[in-house]
Curated annotation (Swiss-Prot):
Stored Pfam families: TFIIE_alpha (PF02002)
GO molecular function: DNA binding
GO biological process: regulation of DNA-templated transcription; transcription initiation at RNA polymerase II promoter
Domain notes: The winged helix domain is involved in binding to DNA in the preinitiation complex.
Gene3D superfamilies from the UniProt entry: Winged helix-like DNA-binding domain superfamily/Winged helix DNA-binding domain
Family note: Belongs to the TFE family.
Keywords, alphabetical: DNA-binding, Transcription, Transcription regulation
Family matches, as InterPro entries: TF_E_archaea (IPR016481), TFE (IPR039997), TFIIE/TFIIEa_HTH (IPR017919), TFIIE_asu (IPR002853), TFIIEa/SarR/Rpc3_HTH_dom (IPR024550), WH-like_DNA-bd_sf (IPR036388), WH_DNA-bd_sf (IPR036390)
Assembly with partners or alone: Monomer. Interaction with RNA polymerase subunits RpoF and RpoE is necessary for Tfe stimulatory transcription activity. Able to interact with Tbp and RNA polymerase in the absence of DNA promoter. Interacts both with the preinitiation and elongation complexes.
Name of this chain's protein: Transcription factor E
Domain of life, source organism: Archaea
Coiled coil, from the record: none
Length: 173
């Protein structure tokens, strides 16, 4: 298994995790004890990272399946303790899943751009589909200026390029 340090040395993974949990979260990961399970309070004490930051980071990682917990109930007090451990071995799968989701959204956007004809109000800089423009008699509903045809070919070309690059990076081009 790859260490946290090795993962964070990868610029793409570091950027992804940084965007997800911020600098303080990265600091928690760097100081996270290897092996075993730890409560959020223990982690805050062991790492010197603020308890709220520890909790926020762990929950964010949990939402992405990059951390897991085991819940223990104190039979005397009824209090629950969550013991956490990292699952950063999944980061590549999580990243790939998110890239595939982004690809799906880009494909849908490209289909929308190719399927529709667009009209724009030069005054308001708002773009409308043909259907909406026709419903408003090709007048802007905001300022009543005439709508002009909008050529979206540059958008479609940019989307195709982006889709091709993503597919190539996923090895499915």
């Amino acid at each position: 298994m790859v260490s946290v340090t090795e993962l964070l040395d990868d610029p793409a993974i570091n950027a992804y995790i940084l965007r997800m949990i911020g600098e303080e979260g990265i600091e928690l990961l760097r100081r996270f004890p290897e092996g075993g399970e730890h409560s959020d309070e223990e982690l805050a004490e062991m790492t010197g990272v603020n308890l709220n930051t520890v909790r926020h980071t762990l929950y964010t990682l949990y939402e992405r399946r990059l951390a897991e917990y085991r819940r223990l109930k104190n039979t005397e007090t009824g209090w629950l303790t969550y013991l956490w451990h990292l699952r950063l071995d999944r980061v590549h799968d999580v990243l790939e899943e998110q890239v595939r989701d982004a690809l799906e959204h880009l494909d849908a956007r490209l289909a929308y751009e190719e399927k529709n004809d667009f009209y724009m109000c030069r005054n308001c800089s708002v773009v409308y589909t043909f259907t909406d423009a026709a419903n408003w008699n090709f007048e802007c509903p905001n300022c009543e200026e005439m709508l002009e045809h909008f050529d979206n070919e540059l958008i479609a070309v940019a989307l195709r390029k982006r889709i091709d690059r993503i597919k190539e990076s996923l090895g499915s081009a």
